[in-house]
A protein has these predicted regions:
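Structured soluble/peripheral alpha/beta segments that form catalytic or ligand/cofactor-binding pockets
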Residues: 1-192
Length: 192
């Protein structure tokens, strides 16, 4: 990363701090997306499954209130584990140096049907995209983001009697690592 991130050094107001780790793993046929976010006034854990062949998608989010940094998202994308959940769901991102393990389950993902999966992302030595964007409207507002693209992915997801296989030869992941203090009214563009 370009600069060190320290949540405690932010002067933009405790309720304005936004932090998330978002992973998308995809191939030509389907994708799964996983989110753990601590947006201070609210936390969000999300699982999305997309089937490009139908086309079809479903997202199930669990929100909590006033997380205020209690999720302890890491100050760097290069180390640190992230996990959250209850008895009914869990999402875990484990960083093992040369690879990452993403594991998850949700008892009621859609219509009472569970979803579960485990994906391994290789961490090759490669470039990534990093931006640090100030907001002209407010001098304490900023967006610090790193996107690590094209991470070779392998693993599977189980949902509704179907196994979605992610083969290393044809499946790739992206980590969208975001931290910052946003202005109240803004426009957000996302691409990878």
């Amino acid at each position: 990363l370009l600069m060190d991130y320290d949540r405690n050094a932010i002067k933009g107001g405790a309720l304005r701090i936004k932090e998330w780790d978002y992973y998308l793993i995809a191939n030509n046929d389907y994708a799964v997306a996983l989110t753990i976010a601590d947006n201070s006034y609210m936390g969000l854990d999300g699982i999305s499954l997309l089937d490009f062949r139908k086309p079809w998608q479903h997202t199930s989010n669990v929100m909590s209130f006033m997380t205020l940094g209690k999720r302890h998202l890491p100050a760097s994308s290069s180390k640190g584990d992230v996990s959250n959940g209850t008895k009914k769901y869990s999402i875990r991102f484990k960083h093992n140096g040369d690879h990452r393990i993403l594991s998850f389950h949700m008892d009621n993902f859609l219509d009472g049907k569970p979803i579960s999966g485990e994906i391994r992302l290789e961490n090759p030595e490669q470039e990534s995209m990093v931006i640090v964007t100030p907001f002209a409207e407010k001098d304490t507002a900023f967006y610090y983001n790193q996107k690590i693209n094209c991470l070779p992915a392998s693993g599977s997801v189980e949902f509704d009697g179907q196994t979605y296989i992610f083969a290393k030869e044809s499946s790739f992941g992206v980590l969208d690592w975001g931290r910052g203090v946003w202005t109240y009214d803004n426009v957000w563009y996302w691409g990878s």
